[in-house]
Amino acid sequence: MAEKRNIFLVGPMGAGKSTIGRHLAQQLHMEFVDSDTVIEERTGADISWVFDVEGEEGFRKREEAVLEDLTQEQGIVLATGGGSVKSKENRNRLSARGVVVYLETTIEKQLARTNRDKKRPLLQTDNPREVLEQLAEERNPLYEEVADYTVRTDDQSAKVVANQIVKMLEER
């Protein structure tokens, strides 16, 4: 990979986008950016607060503005929010401005990885499994549509997944 193209990680919450993204950026000597962290920095509040006050629609508008800016950077590994692919504009930006890697995982792994995380507003419900199933039905086709590569993250360490992605990019 001679040029430093952007690498955009997409996938559901709990797939490992942030953790794998950090490993990947380190291996490739690139900058790691998490779009949710940037939204929190720009807003001065956490994601849960934005959802509570502005609703999902308000959050998605903020996310779209952040992705518009971040996808114009050069040489970054970007962990996107799980719902970022809902917007056609976001999908177009991601596809046009970098290599998109879909980190795929099972509902069981998502539940195991997110069960104590109170910073996930969509899962603050009596039946998080049902929510994750609905989100998967809605979003998985969008992840597949935008992805240049797909990697399963279920039973592998973040480092192993990052190594797989590096190999795929080298073979590109």
Swiss-Prot record:
Binding of ATP: at which residues?
14-19, 120, 156
Query: Which reactions appear under catalytic activity for this entry?
Result: shikimate + ATP = 3-phosphoshikimate + ADP + H(+)
Cofactor(s) in the UniProt record:
Mg(2+)
Name a Pfam family for this protein.
Answer: SKI
> What's an example of a GO molecular-function annotation for this chain?
shikimate kinase activity
Q: Which keywords does UniProt give here?
A: Amino-acid biosynthesis, Aromatic amino acid biosynthesis, ATP-binding, Cytoplasm, Kinase, Magnesium, Metal-binding, Nucleotide-binding, Transferase
Q: Which GO terms describe its cellular component?
A: cytosol
Cofactor binding comment, as recorded: Binds 1 Mg(2+) ion per subunit.
Q: Which InterPro entries match?
A: P-loop_NTPase, Shikimate/glucono_kinase, Shikimate_kinase/TSH1, Shikimate_kinase_CS
Q: Which residues bind Mg(2+)?
A: 18
Annotated substrate binding lies at 36, 60, 82, 139
Subunit description: Monomer.
Function as written in the Swiss-Prot or TrEMBL entry: Catalyzes the specific phosphorylation of the 3-hydroxyl group of shikimic acid using ATP as a cosubstrate.
Task: State the family it belongs to.
Answer: Belongs to the shikimate kinase family.
Write down what this protein is called. Shikimate kinase
